[in-house]
Amino acid sequence: MNEKHPGPLVVEGKLTDAERMKLESNYLRGTIAEDLNDGLTGGFKGDNFLLIRFHGMYQQDDRDIRAERAEQKLEPRHAMLLRCRLPGGVITTKQWQAIDKFAGENTIYGSIRLTNRQTFQFHGILKKNVKPVHQMLHSVGLDALATANDMNRNVLCTSNPYESQLHAEAYEWAKKISEHLLPRTRAYAEIWLDQEKVATTDEEPILGQTYLPRKFKTTVVIPPQNDIDLHANDMNFVAIAENGKLVGFNLLVGGGLSIEHGNKKTYARTASEFGYLPLEHTLAVAEAVVTTQRDWGNRTDRKNAKTKYTLERVGVETFKAEVERRAGIKFEPIRPYEFTGRGDRIGWVKGIDDKWHLTLFIENGRILDYPGRPLKTGLLEIAKIHKGDFRITANQNLIIAGVPESEKAKIEKIAKESGLMNAVTPQRENSMACVSFPTCPLAMAEAERFLPSFIDNIDNLMAKHGVSDEHIVMRVTGCPNGCGRAMLAEVGLVGKAPGRYNLHLGGNRIGTRIPRMHKENITEPEILATLDELIGRWAKEREAGEGFGDFTVRAGIIRPVLDPARDLWD
């Protein structure tokens, strides 16, 4: 096998059971409708347990009380997580009021969880409320279709409130890409919205009868911001503008962060540059990338099924040539672009249309009424009077967008009274965690519940070493699936067991380098002792403007990951 074509285009062998399930599901229907009426269990049975993921839901249970319920001979306290499809994170205030009401009245936890994929999740939906949540979303023009499992997930778009025209154009493309790659099956409408079954055969011209080999993630990125972390995604359209107007995209393919502890066949990978394309080819190219991965992705091993592994197996040039063939185009050379940061600018920013945008820091994206900080009530009050929209960011924050000067003081007053504008350190603003315990079935260690007190300790270290005005991009993910995007952080903690994490160092501020494991299976005191020493060295030895991650590489503390498929585990 030569370098250009290092491996087979299609992996032969026994297909995974997930492939059987999809094939037999009758285009994602399964027996979900019948299962809904089974009151003997709070969960979904058999294939339906996995099929509901295509409808935007995961079956979970409260792991804090799992053992206690088992002792009482009770089944786990099953409840669903539902994730909304919300391209670019834009939600109207009318929609916000509807989701606020549902969260308060029909979920166990009463919260709205903003995610780092620019949407919101409900946690703790009991089976009896599953159909009503889909109907509520539909009534305000939303849905949960294709936000989980083997499809193109929620499409991200840079939350850029400064260049309003460019953002508007990029956002429209994010919506178009999302719509174009949606499944065509009528299963969602039939099961949840009671729409009549039509006497036609379902067809999936893009996704195919067995859909994609694995999850697939897409972004639209507006440099110089990399807030959406493009290298965590399968397909990325980097906006190229001339005179403030969008003219085309650079395409980058094959990013992804999920690994498995100890499995050296798995690795995080940054996306590869394919080339530049004019706007009119965007949908054809998006479809070509997806169908190439559909046909060439590994359906015999789900741990090796994502686009990043397909690219490494067949070769970047081979994959790129196939995309060109299917789309009927030739990529132009990559146009120049650069990233300067990926954090949100917290507070007020004036847009070019004389409207104001207020970015609110929401720790871990969890919107709830806390003692003395009624965040959820405050946002509801703002939603009732605000004429613009809300935008969820990929950093789990919320932008009150398009505020006229005349409304600014009123909205700020509510935000301040609700604790939505409490001062936080730059370090806290640049730290993030996935949900993890108690609801995530894959969690190995705490993440969301661990982060606030952990950052208290990091803030103390930053103050001790005189760098409180600085920040380190710091992320915690409860398991190596990597939802917290720790594998693109300057300091990444990956859960290994309760109270234990792998410590990764050497990523950079702009999110273009994968960090390497520095220490394995260590406790919080060990993490803090390590970081105390390293932050102290960074404070004294850094060069002007040098971020912590770049410093750890330059100082020889960690070797940079240059080719993750080959050297991540070295």
From Swiss-Prot:
GO terms for molecular function: 4 iron, 4 sulfur cluster binding; heme binding; metal ion binding; NADP binding; sulfite reductase (ferredoxin) activity; sulfite reductase (NADPH) activity. It holds the Pfam family NIR_SIR. Pathway: Sulfur metabolism; hydrogen sulfide biosynthesis; hydrogen sulfide from sulfite (NADPH route): step 1/1. Its cofactor is siroheme; [4Fe-4S] cluster. One of its GO terms (biological process) is cysteine biosynthetic process. The keyword Oxidoreductase applies. It is an enzyme of class 1 (oxidoreductase). Its EC number is 1.8.1.2. It catalyses: hydrogen sulfide + 3 NADP(+) + 3 H2O = sulfite + 3 NADPH + 4 H(+). [4Fe-4S] cluster binds at residues 434, 440, 479, 483. Siroheme binds at residue 483. SUPFAM superfamilies: Nitrite and sulphite reductase 4Fe-4S domain-like (SSF56014), Nitrite/Sulfite reductase N-terminal domain-like (SSF55124). The keyword Isomerase does not apply. GO terms for cellular component: sulfite reductase complex (NADPH). Binds 1 siroheme per subunit. Belongs to the nitrite and sulfite reductase 4Fe-4S domain family. Alpha(8)-beta(8). The alpha component is a flavoprotein, the beta component is a hemoprotein. Component of the sulfite reductase complex that catalyzes the 6-electron reduction of sulfite to sulfide. This is one of several activities required for the biosynthesis of L-cysteine from sulfate. This is Sulfite reductase [NADPH] hemoprotein beta-component. It comes from Escherichia fergusonii (strain ATCC 35469 / DSM 13698 / CCUG 18766 / IAM 14443 / JCM 21226 / LMG 7866 / NBRC 102419 / NCTC 12128 / CDC 0568-73).
